[in-house]
């Protein structure tokens, strides 16, 4: 086992803080409408330019093991915020840094770290409850566009295109982001259905650059059982070979000999085929298979209704314009089902939603209804160069996550104002001692940090801006985009409640752990062994007499 180096007390905390500051300082320059870009070196291809906090955080690895531990813990804050809400990573990092800096000062002054942490936790619980009270519903297209615009670094075209996409496919519809070919952003809306089952074998992949399978005008075979014997599929495969069209098999499972034979046939180019598991489980799987059948104009081959796979013909198969399969998802685009039957199926599911008493069942039924009635919207990001394309695509994805979060939990005033208002309302949180009270104060100070950073990035004096906003009421705040003060909601500066809440909770969680750290252990770096020296040359023979 390699030797370890151990640091205690203040020595450990100083090193950890240095790492936190390096990472947070690199991330926080991107915050707000006047935040700057960060350039990331890539081992191949052109450098990546980004304004996305989590992308910057993920790139950072420090040489010093102890500093790196601090940096990695703050990286975790950004990653967690990104996973939960898809945005707010920079805000989370700024909050974490503010709590750690103030917390470690208090620990150095002799306060009890555990009580400080408890005080911070109490303040955060109160703040989250207060945020929910401040939150307003986000349902109209204008508000959705404003949220998207703010998240995409004040790019109105991105906010508008996301709002249009949501309007067309519904808030539950599937929206994907792709790299486009033009200079401008484009929106394609295609009727379709997506479900969370990927390919059963990577050998079906025909688009290695994206790791996906694309089938044009395929037949779709729907089977409500496991398929393991290839003989059952032979009649269908022989009929298909004559048409030259690809086949998608959706079954409970395809395994053993059947899967192996399909893979071999596909690789040899005899039949273009792909197989995926049917979505859902039990009765829900039967219902979802029926949904796919109605959407594609096919029939579900199920023994309980007297249909056998061996006797199936091409008439039993559904068809679609296109099918795209990744390792996680299958999207059926433009199924050729009868529109009247699709509408009837949607009405039937709507009735089931009204009759259902379980929230879980309602949610799943609404999901099915959205997939049948909605469609798939594809936002194609346009840019002049590949470097700009990557940067813009990341912003569009962030904005899409933010708008989904806004629809889910509502919106609050943006620009760091919501946290400032929350802080003013929770000053009197109940605590047990002075150290816990100071923990609450640390959390309240940290809640001003995002507003201060937005002002700093806009070239303003942070303290002046913070005091002006604190002296105001309600949604009064600072618009860094045009350097004015006013009502943030009226100016269209909104943040999703979920994003603000997640940022605060994850920042406080990890910062609290860092404040209570008393020792750090890391491996001692190994010096590489010196190379073996070359052998000395042999002396020459003496001259002969």
From Swiss-Prot:
One GO location term (cellular component): cytoplasm
Keyword line: ATP-binding, Chaperone, Cytoplasm, Isomerase, Nucleotide-binding
Pfam annotation, one family: Cpn60_TCP1
E.C. code: 5.6.1.7
Reaction catalyzed: ATP + H2O + a folded polypeptide = ADP + phosphate + an unfolded polypeptide
Location(s), subcellular: Cytoplasm
Ligand binding (ATP): 30-33, 51, 87-91, 415, 495
Transmembrane region(s): none
Gene Ontology biological process terms, A to Z: protein refolding
Main location: cytoplasm
Alphabetized InterPro entries for the sequence: Chaperonin_Cpn60_CS (IPR018370), Cpn60/GroEL (IPR001844), Cpn60/GroEL/TCP-1 (IPR002423), GroEL-like_apical_dom_sf (IPR027409), GROEL-like_equatorial_sf (IPR027413), TCP-1-like_intermed_sf (IPR027410)
SUPFAM superfamilies in UniProt: GroEL apical domain-like, GroEL equatorial domain-like, GroEL-intermediate domain like
GO MF annotation, one: ATP-dependent protein folding chaperone
NCBIfam families the UniProt entry points to: GroEL, PRK00013.1, PRK12849.1, PRK12850.1, PRK12851.1
Job description of the protein: Together with its co-chaperonin GroES, plays an essential role in assisting protein folding. The GroEL-GroES system forms a nano-cage that allows encapsulation of the non-native substrate proteins and provides a physical environment optimized to promote and accelerate protein folding.
Family: Belongs to the chaperonin (HSP60) family.
Quaternary structure and interacting proteins, as annotated: Forms a cylinder of 14 subunits composed of two heptameric rings stacked back-to-back. Interacts with the co-chaperonin GroES.
Protein name: Chaperonin GroEL
Organism (species): Shewanella frigidimarina (strain NCIMB 400)
Source taxonomy: Bacteria, Pseudomonadati, Pseudomonadota, Gammaproteobacteria, Alteromonadales
Gene: groEL
